[in-house]
Amino acid sequence: MSDIILAIDTSIDHCSVAVYKKKVIYSLSENCKKEHTIKILPMIKKVLMNAKITLKDLNYVAFSKGPGKFTGIRISIGIAQSLSLSLKIPIFGISTLSILAQKAWRKYKKKQILVAVNAKIGQVYWGEYLRNNTLLWTGEKTESLIKINKIEDKMKKLKKKWILVGDGWKKIKRENSLKFEQKKILYPNAKDIIPFLFSENSKPRILSFF
């Protein structure tokens, strides 16, 4: 595939940008806190320069559509929509929780991922993700906003071994169990958006337009 993809994530406290070009991914990630608006555009410019391309070379834009922090999500959506309109190219919105699951696969090659992302007081965004034999993730239908005191009951019902990722696990008390293994993956990375745009035959696959 010769198409060029720009991926953006500003859904939580970290900002990240990635460009896919000729089977190479150029990426940049920074801690943004409340500075998403200030940092994300210079980051995009820097990654484009590293890839030796301009905005006009892009064929697709993908972004993290949440769940996450409202302001950060709106920034990603706004940038993606602006580029789509000005360049007349399609955009793809990918779940933040599925991006975290993909990051766990990239780093640890694990297929059963429990994602918990910090939400409102006493709540987390929850998702149960499974990577199937076609190398695609299932689990977006399990995503929900859940009270922390309800999570232990959900975990007791799960079978097999699960990997825990996301910053929401800092808040969750749980029993020690061989079924669960926590990994130090707190934030999504835009480079993990790229695989969602490919199907088995390596053609771009529209998951959702915003």
Swiss-Prot record:
DNA repair found in the keyword field: no
Gene3D superfamilies membership: 3.30.420.40
Keywords from the UniProt entry: Cytoplasm, tRNA processing
Cross-referenced Pfam families: TsaD
BP GO annotations: tRNA threonylcarbamoyladenosine modification
InterPro entries assigned: ATPase_NBD, Gcp-like_dom, T6A_TsaB
UniProt KW Iron-sulfur keyword: no
Subcellular localization: Cytoplasm
GO cellular component: cytosol
Similarity comment text for this entry: Belongs to the KAE1 / TsaD family. TsaB subfamily.
Function according to Swiss-Prot or TrEMBL: Required for the formation of a threonylcarbamoyl group on adenosine at position 37 (t(6)A37) in tRNAs that read codons beginning with adenine. Is involved in the transfer of the threonylcarbamoyl moiety of threonylcarbamoyl-AMP (TC-AMP) to the N6 group of A37, together with TsaD and TsaE; this reaction does not require ATP in vitro. TsaB seems to play an indirect role in the t(6)A biosynthesis pathway, possibly in regulating the core enzymatic function of TsaD.
NCBIfam families (UniProt xref): T6A_YeaZ
Name the record gives this protein: tRNA threonylcarbamoyladenosine biosynthesis protein TsaB
The species this protein was found in: Buchnera aphidicola subsp. Schizaphis graminum (strain Sg)
